Amino acid sequence: MRTAKDAGALERAALPAEGGLSGAATRLVERLLDVGIDGKGPFDPAHEIAANVLKHARGDADEALRIIARDHRQLGAVGGFVTGLGGFFLMPLSLPANVLEFYLLATRMTAATAKVRGYDIDQPEIRSAILLTLAGADSEDILKKAGLHAAGGKLSAVAFDRLPAPALMVLNKAVGFRLLGRIGQGTFARLGRLVPFVGGLVGAAVDVYMLNRIGKQAAKEFPPVATFGR
């Protein structure tokens, strides 16, 4: 008989309260949506980033996407902004600050990309597609196990099926499980920041590389609204 421990991310997300890990996955997703997309304190919301960059790029969406990706890579290399968000708000996650920084930046970069391309990032299905983009190759497995087809991209798999709110919540939580599962490896890569000079450079390089990959994937997953679904 399979237990919750043996189940995959989607199956575990659909289970009732699973204890600490289940709660951690839920809290991580909530923070990514609430802070990464909607903003908090010094961390500007994705829609504001998109509007300002589009204005700076004089309406050129492609140039705006380049600026968004560049700016977030630079922030990823510097880090440190999480300390300004407030310990009480972030404490329940019990995650290393640099790991949370990375995921918040990746979430906002993806959401801003979607906004520039014409999507309503307040819609639940779009927000789920943003989270799925963070999961990378793992998202295909999540969608497959949910009975959705990702041939046209994660966005089309989620949007075209018009999933009800409970199903979207399960998908979001499954992404949370996958991201938490990566934290051990990601934290190891970033522990180099504790070592002066060389270690810090290695940690920054890892974040920049990963943000660059996610930025390219976001541009692919969120084509211009005028061409979406064709």
Report the location of each language-model feature.
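Terminal, membrane-proximal amphipathic helices
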Residues: 1-81, 107-230
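Conserved phosphate/anionic-ligand binding catalytic regions in large, soluble enzymes, centered on
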Residues: 79-100, 197-203
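Active-site metal-coordination segments of metallo-dependent hydrolases
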Residues: 99, 103, 119-120
